Amino acid sequence: MTLFVPFVLAALALWASEVVADEQQSARISVTGPLTGIDRQTGAAPARMNINDMWARGGPSWDLYVLALAELQAVDESDELSYFQIMGIHGLPFRGWSDVGQVAGGSNMAGFCPHSQTLVTHAIQIAQQYASDKAPTYRDAAEKLRVAYWDWAAVPSLPEVITLENIGVNGPNGPVTIRNPLHSYYFQNYPFTLQYMNGGPLSKQNHSTRCPTKDFVDDVAKYNTFTTVTSFQNMETDRYTSTSFESPHNNVHNTVGCNNGSMYDLNWSAFDPAFMLHHANVDRLIALWQAIYPNASIFNVVDWAGALYGTPAGYVSADTPLKPFHDDGGGYDGFHTSRSVRDISVLGYTYPELQVQSGSGSGGGNSSNSSQSLSPDELADHVRFMVNALYSNLPPQGNDTAPQLRSLAGRLRGMDRVPTRRPHATRKTWSVAISVDRAEVPLPATIGCYLGGEGQQEEQVGRMSLLAIPAEGVTHSSIPLDTALGAVGGLDLADAEEVAGYLNQTLRFEMVKGDGTPIENIGSIPSLQFVVQDRDYTPRENDMEFPTYGPASARKWGRRHGRWAMSD
């Protein structure tokens, strides 16, 4: 959905946020983003941090993050700034928030579908409880605290720290072990009496649930979105034929939630603490994409969206109010819009890859290092380098392997060698494009793509996840095949006919329902299409450029003469 991305940008500001509210809780709450920790000289905002890095480093920021989240989850659920009510903006319990109720034409069986929370205020209050010799350090950490993100694009498995039921931190009175607020949320109003929350399997659980520790199928879909998609609407939604961040986003929901976990059911998903870590990363990936393509950094089309609690079905644009998120000036009709939150710094945060380290680039933590003095082209070069280092699965081409030592800031100062251009031979890259009308499939569902020749173990090489909403509309996804094909000994990826012949013998698809039950005879689904594509691919010439791709040659996959095969 087109509003998905701006909702993330606006609502995530609440996770580590200051809010402006009247004394009456039912009155307007303005979302400003955190106002603390801003560098007074440069105006640069602190960066959100990778949850794995925060846990590994420990220290005041980690202590306060865990303690503040635990305190937030303990706030009475009747409070509009409680964990329950803020996370409830997304789906259940389907009611108003911040004086915004259901609008005429809005759905009474849907939430607002954004993502949000508060944290900094709790952290500052906790920091004041530490002994006088520690208080300044903890106060500084509290002011710079921002929500963490889980970079599932780089490490496709649940962070170990969120699988621990209990966790130890240094509290104001010394070391303490508490119930891990990143593991699950325990509902205070269980057994549920609220309308819509007292039915279904998840209503039988007094806390959010998820799969056991589970690795995902790793692919380069996220890298391909950076390198091949130059249109905002194509990047952020799976309604178009190109690859997008929406597809891996959906895969994370289904994989973390399994068949009946909180993340699998979008009405309940926001209550799982993994939800915010997940969507903070989606926000981060989009922010990096926007830095690379600054002239396409917001959608400029009018698109159709289904009814939500605060939004009737109809056309939406970059100026559509993002209810229920009131702004503090600059939005439309008192609300944030996609246009007003395009620059994430106005909401008081940034990401490490958008910070250009000064000097040797050996900075750390979430301290502010401004990139505001760079031109858009220079920042794009820097972010392309970071994306290549993180997601291309290829080593840097220069001598310096540490990305921070090869930062753009250092290069501009003459401290780093400008990477030399190395010509590379063009080869083929392979993928499968999948499309289906959701109205023809029992939702939620997952389409799996498998490869395995005679005498080889069949392996899943990718999947397309269809969430429960929206209930209709054509969805697209693209599954890269290069990694799997590259592992096949003796297969020449540059020979299109040889690869096509191999795929005819080894490629298989299946579709399963939310409970894991296979959907039989998927060939009878009228809109379901599988298209094998090959394109000429020229690797990047240096670390600040992306590879280039030629036009796609398409081979439709279908049943012919009683078996599945590709057309010529």
Sequence positions of predicted segments:
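Fungal secretory targeting signals
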Residues: 1-29
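C-terminal accessory segments of proteins
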Residues: 22-568
